[in-house]
A protein has these predicted regions:
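Amphipathic, Lys/Arg-enriched alpha-helical "gate/interface" segment within cytosolic domains
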Residues: 1-137
Length: 137
């Protein structure tokens, strides 16, 4: 798996991308790396782009663990941008384990809708600057 993120402090949004294969360890690493970044605020919203997630290798215990260490506050809006059954499955399981409501945690199939959900204009593009962190290949 590879993942990257951009912390957009002025807009209070984290833009995350995950592609390839995702394991328990990699998902936990992403959450911990975000939490440890001094620019990160747990009240930020997030768009997580999972459209290129090809292979989900997370276990049920690993997913439960991830749900408990999610660095975002329960009232933060998290838009999951999905394109495959694997990404949708992960999103729905996390949604269940975190006990989040649809006001905080929603699946989208298009970027403009996800942007609007986190409070940005629908025409806002994905950040074109280099990611703050990139892991994997």
């Amino acid at each position: 798996m590879a993942y990257s993120f951009v912390i957009d402090v002025p807009r209070r949004v984290v833009f995350s991308r995950i592609w390839g294969t995702l394991t328990d360890e990699q998902a936990v690493s992403h959450a911990k790396t975000l939490k440890d970044d001094p620019r990160f605020d747990s009240g930020f919203n997030q768009i997580i782009d999972l459209r290129e997630l090809a292979n989900l290798q997370m276990t049920s215990p690993g997913t439960k663990n991830l749900a408990h260490i999610v660095p975002f506050r329960p009232d933060a809006k998290r838009a999951f941008l999905v394109g495959t059954g694997e990404a949708e499955k992960l999103s729905k399981v996390l949604w269940t384990y975190t006990e989040a409501g649809v006001d905080q945690y929603t699946l989208f199939r298009d970027l403009p809708s996800a942007m609007e959900f986190v409070g940005l204009d629908a025409k806002t593009p994905w950040p074109d600057r280099a990611p703050d962190q990139t892991f994997g290949s």
